[in-house]
Amino acid sequence: FITAAFGIPQISTGDMLRAAIKAGTPLGLEAKKIIDEGGLVRDDIIIGMVKERIAQDDCKNGFLFDGFPRTLAQAEAMVEAGVDLDAVVEIDVPDSVIVDRMSGRRVHLASGRTYHIAYNPPKVEGKDDVTGEDLIQRDDDKEETVKKRLDVYHGQTEVLVGFYSKLTGEHAPK
């Protein structure tokens, strides 16, 4: 809705990383190993990707970050680069709900269609509604991996709430 209303792109580091993984690039292969283990891809890689992306023409009137920044270093790098944010939104969801939602997700890899075993199940369990092909659970959606990612979030990302609430001056979001 926001991207359509303002005519701006959504910038998802997750989507950028998944594209690199699918393409089998060196970055993609490195990222896949880290992501599958529940870790976060190194800040320097993510920051470089984001800076490159927001320099593209379609971002000249703005953009919507999705899942970025995830670490204090990433947030500080954006401030240092003079990237002004109009607003920052935190969506606070209990860990148990996140584990349930993510571990219940199933994907048809060829099309990207996404299902959920409880909230949006396919017509036939484990099969894509359109093709009848198998659905998979991505490695990063497995319960143990989700729990590891939440531990990383609490250790590295949660501090951003305080960072943005204390940020003042010309780069402070509303």
Swiss-Prot record:
Its main location: cytoplasm. Pathway: Purine metabolism; AMP biosynthesis via salvage pathway; AMP from ADP: step 1/1. Residues 104-141 are annotated as: LID. Residues 12-41 are annotated as: NMP. GO terms for cellular component: cytoplasm. It is found in: Cytoplasm. It comes from the Bacteria. Keywords: ATP-binding, Cytoplasm, Kinase, Nucleotide biosynthesis, Nucleotide-binding, Transferase. CDD domains: ADK. GO terms for molecular function: adenylate kinase activity; ATP binding. AMP binds at T13, R18, G39, L40, V41, G67, F68, P69, R70, Q74, R138, R149. ATP binds at R105, T114, Y115. The keyword ATP-binding applies. InterPro entries: Adenyl_kin_sub, Adenylat/UMP-CMP_kin, Adenylat_kinase_CS, Adenylate_kinase_lid-dom, P-loop_NTPase. PROSITE patterns: ADENYLATE_KINASE. It catalyses: AMP + ATP = 2 ADP. Its EC number is 2.7.4.3. Monomer. Belongs to the adenylate kinase family. Consists of three domains, a large central CORE domain and two small peripheral domains, NMPbind and LID, which undergo movements during catalysis. The LID domain closes over the site of phosphoryl transfer upon ATP binding. Assembling and dissambling the active center during each catalytic cycle provides an effective means to prevent ATP hydrolysis. This is Adenylate kinase. It comes from Neisseria animalis.
